[in-house]
Regions:
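Acidic, Gly/Pro-rich loop/turn segments at junctions of secondary structure
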Residues: 103-196
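A short LG(V/I)-centered, amphipathic sequence patch enriched
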Residues: 19-36
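Central regulatory/effector-binding core of bacterial HTH transcription factors
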Residues: 70-128
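C-terminal effector-binding regulatory domain of bacterial HTH transcription factors
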Residues: 45, 97, 160, 217-225, ...
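Hydrophobic hinge/microswitch elements
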Residues: 187-228, 250
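Short helix-loop hinge/linker segments at domain boundaries
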Residues: 31-34, 41, 52-73
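Conserved amphipathic alpha-helical core elements
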Residues: 18-19, 226
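Helix-turn-helix DNA-binding motif, specifically the short coil turn and the N-cap/start of the second
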Residues: 5-10, 14
Length: 270
C-alpha cells in the first residue's frame, strides 16, 4: 500500500477480488499480515516475469526513436573515463538534442532490458545470444611502482622475486581482468596488501607508493615518474569489446555514436 500510495484497505479489496476471480487463495491471513500461498507464489513469479518484459519493451522503445536525440546510455570501465569522456562530450556538442548518460563501474548492465545503448566490456568476448559484439581495441598494461616504493623496497629481480614485494590488487577476487588474474597466480595473497574496487584508485595507490600495481599506457604518460618493474607481458593485455543489443544496434543514434567512437579511438594510445 505504501509503495502504491493507496490505503491498505484498497489493496485488501483488490486481493479479495483477485482471489474470487481466480477461485483460489493467494494469501494466508494472520495477525502479523499476509503470507503467500503456493498459488500466490506462482502468481508472483509470473507477475515478476511480466514486469521484466514490460521494462525490456519500454527500454527498447525508448532506444528506437528516430534521429540522434533523447538519452544515449553508455557503460564502461572507469579506467576508460579519461579517454572516453572527451569523445562523449564532443558527440553531445555535435548533437545538441542528446542527453548523455555515462555509467562507469564493473556492473554488467542488461542490454536486453534497455539499461544501456552501448557497453564497453573487457575480458573474454561477451557471449549473450541477443548482443552484437565487436572488437574495440586491446589495452596494454604495465606493472609499475612509484619512486618512493622503489627507494624503500627496491625493484623485483624477476618473477621469482615478486613474492618478496608488496602489491596493489583488486578487492573482487573474481575479477575478469587478465592482469588481475595473473597477479593472483604469481603473488601470494598475503603480499597483496592494498586492495581497491576502482581502477582509477589503483593508479592513485601506485602513485602514492602503496605498492606495485598495474596501470595503462595512458596512465604511464600522465605519470612519467612511475617505474616499470618488469617488461609488459602479452598475457596482461585486456581486450575490449563494443556491445549493443540486436534490437538497438541498427538505430540511427547507436550507429552514429559507434561510427564517431571508432574514428576517435583510432588515435588512442591506451
Amino acid at each position: 500500500a505504501e509503495i502504491l500510495r493507496v490505503h491498505h484497505a484498497t489493496v485488501i479489496r483488490h486481493i479479495d477480488a483477485l482471489e474470487q476471480r481466480l477461485g483460489v487463495k493467494l494469501f494466508q491471513r494472520h495477525a502479523r499480515g499476509y503470507t503467500a500461498t503456493e498459488a500466490g507464489q506462482d502468481l508472483m513469479q509470473v507477475a515478476t516475469a511480466t514486469d521484466d518484459q514490460f521494462t525490456q519493451l519500454a527500454g527498447r522503445i525508448r532506444g528506437q526513436s528516430d534521429g540522434v536525440s533523447g538519452d544515449l546510455v553508455v557503460t564502461s570501465l572507469v579506467m576508460l573515463s579519461p579517454v572516453l569522456t572527451p569523445v562523449l562530450a564532443q558527440f553531445r556538442r555535435e548533437n545538441p538534442d542528446l542527453t548523455v548518460r555515462f555509467l562507469t563501474g564493473a556492473r554488467l548492465f542488461r542490454l536486453e532490458y534497455g539499461e544501456a545503448h552501448v557497453a564497453i566490456r573487457a575480458g573474454e568476448a561477451p557471449s549473450q545470444p541477443d548482443n552484437v559484439v565487436q572488437p574495440f581495441f586491446s589495452q596494454t598494461m604495465h606493472l609499475v611502482a612509484a619512486p618512493s616504493y622503489i627507494e624503500q623496497h627496491g625493484t623485483p629481480d624477476g618473477i621469482d622475486d615478486l613474492v618478496n614485494h608488496w602489491f596493489i590488487g583488486h578487492d573482487n577476487i573474481d575479477s575478469r581482468a587478465p592482469f588481475i588474474r595473473w597477479l593472483a597466480e604469481k603473488v601470494p595473497e598475503n603480499r597483496i596488501v592494498f586492495r581497491i574496487t576502482d581502477d582509477r584508485a589503483m593508479v592513485d595507490a601506485v602513485v602514492s607508493g602503496a605498492g606495485i600495481g598495474f596501470v595503462s599506457t595512458w596512465d604511464m604518460r600522465q605519470h612519467p615518474e612511475l617505474i616499470e618493474v618488469m617488461p609488459s607481458q602479452k598475457e596482461w593485455t585486456a581486450p575490449l569489446w563494443l556491445v549493443t543489443h540486436v534490437d538497438l544496434h541498427r538505430t540511427t543514434k547507436v550507429q552514429a555514436f559507434l561510427k564517431f567512437l571508432k574514428e576517435k579511438a583510432s588515435d588512442w594510445e591506451v
